[in-house]
Amino acid sequence: MGKGDPNKPRGKMSSYAYFVQTCREEHKKKHPDSSVNFAEFSRKCSERWKTMSSKEKGKFEEMAKGDKARYDREMKNYVPPKGEKKGKKKDPNAPKRPPSAFFLFCSEHRPKIKNDHPGLSIGDTAKKLGEMWSEQLAKDKQPYEQKAAKLKEKYEKDIAAYRAKSKSDAGKKGPGRPAGSKKKAEPEEEEEEEEDEEEEEEEEDEE
């Protein structure tokens, strides 16, 4: 899937991401021993960015252009590892794996973060969502956990019905098929479902 490929070029940074990076460095120099409240820090960065002139933003926009050129150049020479996402065909009728409580939380809050912090990179958005989730009280997490539990319960019923139907269909189509091969299909289906979940997260991050 390429997520762990160490040779894949680092993603390009936006002008706002460079600005936030600069703000972090300034904060570390002024307050080397103090910890950063990420939510408060991001809010201040966003407010400061909105009041900056085009001339002040120009430096960061030039940095972003340079990084985009670097990224485009590296991507031209990048060759993905062989055999990625090949081999198994996914059944479009297979039930999708349910999202976790954290994933439901991210889906709800990501649009607001993008609106409040335009230009924030995918990595910084994910980090902010993670910190927001960890700051939530147990009672605030409960609605997401309850919804995730219901979706998981529904998925388990759906996947059981799907597998029963798949075995029934396989029995009709291939009477000469070895009995042991049916059991082998189940782990593969589980692997496919895990890939589906990872791909959904990647797609949502890239929106």
From Swiss-Prot:
Give the GO molecular function terms: DNA binding, bending; four-way junction DNA binding
Which keywords has UniProt assigned to this entry?
Chromosome, Cytoplasm, Disulfide bond, DNA recombination, DNA-binding, Immunity, Inflammatory response, Innate immunity, Nucleus, Oxidation, Repeat, Secreted, Transcription, Transcription regulation
Instruction: Give a Gene Ontology cellular component term annotated to this protein.
Output: extracellular space
Where are the residues of the annotated region Disordered?
52-102, 162-207
Residues modified to Cysteine sulfonic acid (-SO3H): 23, 45, 106
InterPro entries xrefs? HMG_box_dom, HMG_box_dom_sf, HMG_boxA_CS, HMGB
- Show the ranges annotated as biased composition (Acidic residues): 187-207
UniProt keyword annotation of NAD present: no
Q: Where is the composition biased (Basic and acidic residues)?
A: 52-76, 162-172
Give the DNA-binding residues: 9-79, 95-163
SUPFAM superfamilies linked to this entry:
HMG-box (SSF47095)
Which PROSITE patterns has this protein been placed in? HMG_BOX_1 (PS00353), HMG_BOX_2 (PS50118)
Task: Report any one BP term from Gene Ontology.
Answer: inflammatory response to antigenic stimulus
Pfam families given in the database record: HMG_box (PF00505), HMG_box_2 (PF09011)
Which cysteines link up through disulfide bonds?
A: 23-45
- Explain the post-translational modification: Reduction/oxidation of cysteine residues Cys-23, Cys-45 and Cys-106 and a possible intramolecular disulfide bond involving Cys-23 and Cys-45 give rise to different redox forms with specific functional activities in various cellular compartments: 1- fully reduced HMGB2 (HMGB2C23hC45hC106h), 2- disulfide HMGB2 (HMGB2C23-C45C106h) and 3- sulfonyl HMGB2 (HMGB2C23soC45soC106so).
* Entry's localization field: Nucleus; Chromosome; Cytoplasm; Secreted
Similarity-based family: Belongs to the HMGB family.
Q: Provide the function of this protein.
A: Multifunctional protein with various roles in different cellular compartments. May act in a redox sensitive manner. Associates with chromatin and binds DNA with a preference to non-canonical DNA structures such as single-stranded DNA. Can bent DNA and enhance DNA flexibility by looping thus providing a mechanism to promote activities on various gene promoters. Proposed to be involved in the innate immune response to nucleic acids by acting as a cytoplasmic promiscuous immunogenic DNA/RNA sensor. Involved in inflammatory response to antigenic stimulus coupled with pro-inflammatory activity.
The protein's name? High mobility group protein B2
> What organism, scientifically named, is this protein from?
Gallus gallus
Native organism taxonomy: Eukaryota, Metazoa, Chordata, Craniata, Vertebrata
